[in-house]
């Protein structure tokens, strides 16, 4: 049965997920706050700033009118930058009140809210009371929009405490190149999704400095240990971190030239200033803000996260990357598994 799905956010991932939903025989409305982007998608069926050369289905409808996008939708998918999640949720709840709708909410954004350090599902649940929505489901895992656009094989996770809602999202997105697994551990899935971006900056920096595979593998492995420690402290299942949204997402983000966070770290490793890197990228680098959140949460919980602290020192305290690497290597000997 055809369902109307509203996708909020027409960046790389949002527009490609809209394409998946359209291909799976849904009526898809793609909301953007840019008139020029909506016009390009509707008239040329392209999104050149985000996915150059990709042709979108002519049946996807783009709009800057949130009410038009959401009216009659059985599900609403958030794929907007973390910094505007709360604002968009506030706008959405007013529309839902007016329309008298109660859709399933899905989000595929990765990061934490700046300042509060809250997970994205927490922010959405705060701003959209349960009387105006069904469950909130997290869609996350090792995925690059460019590869899904080419219909490369991709596996990700739909997480919700209510597995029936996770299974609903599974059925909406799954096809012959995109496979969805379900998980009840929302905390673990969102934690892995957010904090892997921090480690990707570090791995990118190692590459920029000319370090080899050994160093990168070590940083990824010890970085995963830090992510797991922090997630478990907040109630996550440790097994989640060896799944798609944990080690899977970490691998793809730390090893691919598609990764914005890896590319940012790579440029830092080559000696570029942070401000210059941000300007050159022209897109959101979630790991920069998430690093600050991870560092502050680790301090609050008294959790040892030396790699995160080193990356924080480079990003926020202007420390030299090579000096931070030396300090990490000079730490006293430790047991690996503890």
UniProtKB/Swiss-Prot annotation:
Catalytic center residues: 196
Main location group: cytoplasm
Keywords: Cytoplasm, Lipid biosynthesis, Lipid metabolism, NAD, NADP, Nucleotide-binding, Oxidoreductase, Phospholipid biosynthesis, Phospholipid metabolism
Enzyme class: oxidoreductase
Family: Belongs to the NAD-dependent glycerol-3-phosphate dehydrogenase family.
Name by which UniProt lists this protein: Glycerol-3-phosphate dehydrogenase [NAD(P)+]
Domain of life: Bacteria
Keyword Lipid biosynthesis: yes
Residues engaged in binding NADPH: 12-13, 34, 110, 145, 260, 284, 286
EC code(s) of this entry: 1.1.1.94
Functional summary from the UniProt entry: Catalyzes the reduction of the glycolytic intermediate dihydroxyacetone phosphate (DHAP) to sn-glycerol 3-phosphate (G3P), the key precursor for phospholipid synthesis.
Subcellular location: Cytoplasm
SUPFAM superfamilies referenced in this protein's UniProt entry, alphabetically: 6-phosphogluconate dehydrogenase C-terminal domain-like, NAD(P)-binding Rossmann-fold domains
InterPro entries linked: 6-PGluconate_DH-like_C_sf, 6PGD_dom2, G3P_DH_NAD-dep, G3P_DH_NAD-dep_C, G3P_DH_NAD-dep_N, NAD(P)-bd_dom_sf
Single annotated GO MF: glycerol-3-phosphate dehydrogenase [NAD(P)+] activity
Entry's Gene Ontology cellular component terms: cytosol
Chain sites annotated for binding sn-glycerol 3-phosphate: 110, 141, 143, 196, 249, 259-261
Reaction(s) catalysed by this chain's protein: sn-glycerol 3-phosphate + NAD(+) = dihydroxyacetone phosphate + NADH + H(+); sn-glycerol 3-phosphate + NADP(+) = dihydroxyacetone phosphate + NADPH + H(+)
An annotated GO BP: phospholipid biosynthetic process
Pathway in which this enzyme or protein is active: Membrane lipid metabolism; glycerophospholipid metabolism
Phylogenetic lineage: Bacteria, Bacillati, Bacillota, Bacilli, Lactobacillales
């Amino acid at each position: 049965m055809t369902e109307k799905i509203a996708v909020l956010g027409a960046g790389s991932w949002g527009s490609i997920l809209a394409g998946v939903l359209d291909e799976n025989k849904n009526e898809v409305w793609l909301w953007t706050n840019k008139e020029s982007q909506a016009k390009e998608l509707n008239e040329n069926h392209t999104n050149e700033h985000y996915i150059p050369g990709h042709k979108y289905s002519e049946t996807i409808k783009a709009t800057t009118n949130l009410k038009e996008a959401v009216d009659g939708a059985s599900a609403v998918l958030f794929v907007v930058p973390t910094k505007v999640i709360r604002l968009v949720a506030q706008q959405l709840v007013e529309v839902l009140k007016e329309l008298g709708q109660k859709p399933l909410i899905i989000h595929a954004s990765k990061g934490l809210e700046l300042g509060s350090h809250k997970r994205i599902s927490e922010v959405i649940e705060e701003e959209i009371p349960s009387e105006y929505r069904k469950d909130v489901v997290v869609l996350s895992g090792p995925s690059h929009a460019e590869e899904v656009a080419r219909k490369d094989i991709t596996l990700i996770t739909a997480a919700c405490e209510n597995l029936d809602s996770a299974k609903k999202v599974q059925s909406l997105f799954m096809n012959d190149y995109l496979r969805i697994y379900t998980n009840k551990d929302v905390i673990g899935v969102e934690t892995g999704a957010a904090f892997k971006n921090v480690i990707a900056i570090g791995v990118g920096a190692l590459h920029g400095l000319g370090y080899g595979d050994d160093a990168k593998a070590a940083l990824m492995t010890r970085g995963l240990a830090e992510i797991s420690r922090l997630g478990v402290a907040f109630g996550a299942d440790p097994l989640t971190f060896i799944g798609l949204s944990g080690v899977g997402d970490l691998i793809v983000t730390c090893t691919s030239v598609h990764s914005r966070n890896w590319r940012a770290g790579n440029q830092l490793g080559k000696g570029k200033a942070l401000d210059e890197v941000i300007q050159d990228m022209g897109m959101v680098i979630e790991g920069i803000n998430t690093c600050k959140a991870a560092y502050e949460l680790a301090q609050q919980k008294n959790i040892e996260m030396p790699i995160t602290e080193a990356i924080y020192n480079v990003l926020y305290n202007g420390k030299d990357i090579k000096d931070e690497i030396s300090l990490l290597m000079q730490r006293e000997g430790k047991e690996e598994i503890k």
